[in-house]
């Protein structure tokens, strides 16, 4: 990670790059392969490889029927649902447990909105555990032509008070929600379950606006140090200038500055499970896994660290789970980091967020990718 400053350009523009390669992605997914963008960052004695699934790791579940009981339904909104799939009951439960927060339900929700140059941005939903924070922001008053991708010029995200202090740094990627989600097998579809469509130029058609003409920007932030926690922290988010993006280039359309300080929920939803099993074909033993409804951290002891392969560190990656009812979610994890946690390379970890909420009590086994050649094994866990 750069030591200059904690300012992130909106560089993780997965939609255009990914969507232009959707056909290739389909073929690879059918072979149970996955495309991912990798970046290796070295910081002191800690080595991290940042990665994000190239088939946009976002998904949605339609809202279920209205309860006959007069109760508040904590609906997370289109963008958050598109980022981390949750059933109606899961949304309700996580919000009532203060793991998630729906800002539009707050009495002072109107005071949270920031308007500049006729464009209003306001926080919508936050879902948090120790390692990851998912944040969605609604955008009103800005419109783009069909076939163009909206975006901000610069997005700055940091925790604490001083963006120059290393302790304030977070890993982050973000983009405008485009209405495209993965199904349980990782194949991209529209949020209503229909197959993707292309325009006359062969580009996949995206759906950035909702029925009200509003958009949502989605951020996934995670800790830099595997021992840090985001619970109860203040997350600063700043957006500058709106425009469009094409092949990585930003074209400004509206100047503006929208600044937010978001206090994250402070309730822990993670539990530590002792595994103590060797990862077959590797020199790694999965000692424990810290797992929550929205992310996990696999903790390894290392008998012998392998030689890296290009940008691959050789650390096994937990990519999915098998549930007790037999359901397989082979592409559950979506973005995260991995690295050796000491200079001797005798310990390592892999942290990753999910593309959908899971019930930790229903997890029977982990699907682990053991090498850059994408060999897979299942490791049963008990709780």
Language model region names:
Residues 10, 22, 30, 66-383:
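Alpha-helical, hydrophobic structural elements that either
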Residues 39, 54, 312-314:
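Intrinsic structural disorder/low-complexity segments
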Residues 1-46:
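Disordered, charged N-terminal biogenesis/targeting segments of membrane/secreted proteins
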Residues 41-72:
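Internal signal-anchor transmembrane helix that establishes type II topology
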Residues 15, 49-51, 359:
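Alpha-helix initiation/capping motif
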